[in-house]
């Protein structure tokens, strides 16, 4: 039996692949042995835990909760600030109501433009001390601030509708409005309209002559009420002034030149009483006594020198001289009353004086 001298020699020299020996000639019998893979259960736990802790659903939930928390915090801060501001404003309003003065001091008395009233007219409206049992005021609360009236509290009482309001509330309203905030009635009747408006209402009457040929002269009336009409609303004020002193003084001279029918009509005109027509919501009243006093003062100062001399001489509107008789027929015996409507700004005359020649100031 033959033996291999070197049993541990490699089998590289063998070319027979049927023996199942791995060599370079028989690579199909060669196997690569890979190292065993690491245990997989540790990696699965880590990956599952990381994926579960950062899932998109959890991220979305966290974002929603954070946004809701921010919105709630913002709303809380805004509500607290607004509530504090409202309490401060309410306390200041109550303090001003107790003091009875209002928001406007003497340094804030300015005139307002538009439809509102000026400060002097607002201050002239009646101030009333509230008493709960007298029943003089309709209601027990202010319609502007919706707060209850307190006993002996100063309220401003509107003249036409008798609605009462707190001083600061109604003063602020009347700065930009001329009517009642509750019933929309115009605030027209005040206690002292001529002083509150602050306009110079001057009545200038022409000097009257003592001549027997003069039958009357035109009373020139200058009413400086341009600003009054725009500030106090629609005032249907009618002022009627009738000068009967001149008519009574010259009625005899005129009666000699007229026919019996004209004398009868003239007698009816001369017997008319002194009238003063003022609408109910008027703010301006010109007294007849004041007009007569102005006539006497003007006569005493200038001694009858003025527009009456031109009327006495019979001077026409075009500069021509006409006879006294014709001048008497034009002017008439009784100087007619003069009507001026503040709401329309037009000048109208009575039915007795439509045909007379008047010279109105420009």
Swiss-Prot record:
Membrane-protein topology: Single-pass membrane protein
UniProt-listed Enzyme Commission number(s): 2.3.2.27
Name of a matching Pfam family: zf-RING_2
Tissues/organs with expression: Expressed in flowers.
Pathway this chain belongs to: Protein modification; protein ubiquitination
A Gene Ontology biological process term: protein ubiquitination
A GO MF label: transferase activity
Compartments, record wording: Membrane
Ranges annotated as RING-type zinc finger: 142-184
Keywords assigned by UniProt, alphabetized: Membrane, Metal-binding, Transferase, Transmembrane, Transmembrane helix, Ubl conjugation pathway, Zinc, Zinc-finger
Taxonomic superkingdom: Eukaryota
Domain comment as written in the entry: The RING-type zinc finger domain mediates binding to an E2 ubiquitin-conjugating enzyme.
Name this protein carries in UniProt: RING-H2 finger protein ATL52
Species in which this protein is naturally found: Arabidopsis thaliana (Mouse-ear cress)
Gene: ATL52
């Amino acid at each position: 039996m033959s033996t291999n001298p070197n049993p541990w020699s490699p089998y590289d020299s063998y070319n027979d692949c049927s023996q199942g020996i791995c060599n370079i000639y028989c690579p199909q019998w060669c196997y690569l042995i890979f190292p065993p893979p690491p245990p997989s259960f540790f990696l699965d736990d880590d990956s599952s835990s990381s994926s579960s802790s950062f899932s998109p659903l959890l991220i979305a939930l966290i974002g929603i909760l954070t946004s809701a928390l921010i919105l709630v915090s913002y709303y809380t801060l805004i509500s607290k600030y607004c509530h504090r501001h409202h309490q401060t404003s309410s306390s200041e309003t109550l303090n001003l109501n107790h003091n009875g003065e209002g928001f406007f001091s003497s340094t804030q008395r300015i005139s307002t433009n538009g439809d509102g009233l000026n400060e002097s007219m607002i201050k002239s409206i009646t101030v009333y001390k509230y008493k709960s049992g007298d029943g003089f005021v309709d209601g027990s609360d202010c319609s502007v601030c919706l707060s209850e009236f307190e006993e002996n509290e100063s309220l401003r009482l509107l003249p036409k509708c008798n609605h009462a309001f707190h001083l600061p509330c109604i003063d602020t309203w009347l700065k930009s409005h001329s009517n009642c905030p509750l019933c929309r009635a115009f605030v027209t009747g005040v206690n002292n309209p001529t002083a509150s408006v602050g306009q110079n209402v001057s009545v200038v009457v022409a000097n009257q002559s003592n001549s027997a040929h003069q039958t009357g002269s035109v009373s020139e009336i200058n009413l400086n009420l341009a600003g009054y009409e725009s500030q106090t609303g629609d005032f249907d004020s009618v002022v009627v002034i009738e000068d009967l002193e001149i008519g009574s003084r010259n009625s005899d001279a005129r009666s000699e030149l007229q026919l019996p029918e004209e004398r009868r009509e003239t007698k009816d005109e001369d017997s008319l009483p002194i009238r003063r027509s003022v609408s109910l919501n008027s703010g301006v009243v010109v007294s007849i006594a004041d007009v007569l006093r102005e006539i006497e003062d003007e006569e005493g100062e200038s001694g009858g020198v003025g527009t009456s001399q031109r009327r006495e001489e019979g001077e026409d509107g075009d500069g021509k001289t006409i006879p006294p008789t014709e001048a008497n027929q034009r002017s008439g015996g009784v100087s007619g009353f003069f009507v001026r409507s503040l709401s329309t700004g037009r000048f109208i005359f009575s039915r007795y004086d439509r045909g007379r020649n008047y010279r109105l100031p420009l």
